Amino acid sequence: MPPRRSHKKSRAGCRRCKNRKIKCDEVHPRCGNCAKHGVPCDFSNPDVLEELAISTNTSTESVGAPTPSPAPTVNFNSAPRTPLTRPRAPSSPARAPRPNPSPPTSVYSQPSISSSTNTIDHGERMLELRLMHHYTNVTSKTLLTNSPAAEDIWQRAVPQMAFSGNGKTYLADAILSVAALHLRSMSPNDKALVRASHAYSASSLSAFGASLGAGITPENAEALFLTATLIAFQASASRIFVKDDGDAAPGDPTVRYVPPLSWFHAFQGVKTVVANSWQWIHHSDIVKVIIDSQPSFQLNLNPRSPDSFFGHMLEGLADELSNEDPRLVASTTQAYSHAVSVLNWAHKNYHAAAALTFTATVSKRYVDLVDARRPRALAILACFFALLKRMDNVWWLQDVARREVMGLVSLFEPGSKWWRHLEWPIRIAVLDGSSIPQDIWGTELEEQAPEQQNVLGSMTQHIEMFAEMLNQHTQPPIPIADEDLIVPDSPD
């Protein structure tokens, strides 16, 4: 009998496969075993994002009060109502906290040391140098920055901040993870890049979550904002590696299309981090350039106005809500109306990247409606993905419009009344390339939305309003003692 071939054991599998002691194919964002059994996979909703999506506590500890409150967490699904600080001692939590996964070693944390040669592992070092080189020279220029100044920030200032260290390994690992994803998109069969993208993502998420749990401070606010942005980018870019089920027949019971809720969780997480750290980062030259590069958020609050391209998405809403829980009627109406308003704004905007604002600005109620597979919410989501067609030449958005729109369409029954509302996104999705004729797009693009009385202002004003609503009832951060600092588990 020939000897068994040796193999290198991977620790990058999902938690469910590890618990079941079966081999994980490590396909992101949902491994083959989880997809086969129709169960959630922590690749599609990583631990830290899942934990950070838990609603924060509604009460805070009064200064000097004898009874401390539980440590709040960032809510990646909805706005938290407590500051991102950590009390000195937590009270009894509702559930036991999960230990942080052991992050992979890197030259930015604790490098791999050979017991015989006492040197850094050459292969790991060369891979990290390759990833950082690719990020600074290529990937940083694909982040849809809208301005040369913002591009320079991501290309030069962000890596410099990562190099400065100060214990902020999560920013360096987030950079390496994004670079690995980019290289992996060009070499999908390179297993080293697959493992690297998984490992650096897990490491970044673990350290990022620990830092958020300890609290946002003037010292870490910039790095946390930049890392949250790169995590959101990872959540979006990882979607290109999902098995394509967009060509399934409508109503096909075997279809496994799942709407990418991770996009919403991650981008709304960026908004939450920004709002909770705004008192510090709005003075940052780095953050100011990034925020100012975003299109002016002039939102018409009347989605049923005569020039509303997507106003038809609200037809029949009153009749639909007659069977809704009375406690949810107002929030559901507002969720749909606001989502349509954002679509109208992005549809006319000269800057194609304006469409990505949708994932960060829609309400938690709308995300819940998508999760519940409400037809109206899914039709609106199909229009959002159709808007991304203008960026089909960007590597992490390539073919996303077609795949996601057709995937969403597959969730509708053949005789659904919603088919006429899906005609426009389907027409856009099946086009070749990112150049779309104006008669098909449906409107003329505007450099800036026209001034109107009933609009929201600049992106900075929008953030300041959100931050004020978030923090008007909060207290000053509680100082953190050395013994309160979270230390990640040591590697096996």
UniProtKB/Swiss-Prot annotation:
Highest taxon above the source species: Eukaryota
Effect on the protein of changing S102A: Impairs phosphorylation by HOG1, blocks induction of CYP51A expression and exhibits hypersensitivity to tebuconazole
A single GO molecular function term of this UniProt record: DNA-binding transcription factor activity, RNA polymerase II-specific
Keyword field contains Transcription: yes
Biased composition (Low complexity): 78-95
GO cellular component, one term: nucleus
CDD domains cross-referenced by the UniProt entry: GAL4
Pfam families xref list: Fungal_trans_2, Zn_clus
Subunit structure: Interacts with HOG1.
This protein's name: Zn(2)-C6 fungal-type transcription factor
Organism in which the protein naturally occurs: Gibberella zeae (strain ATCC MYA-4620 / CBS 123657 / FGSC 9075 / NRRL 31084 / PH-1)
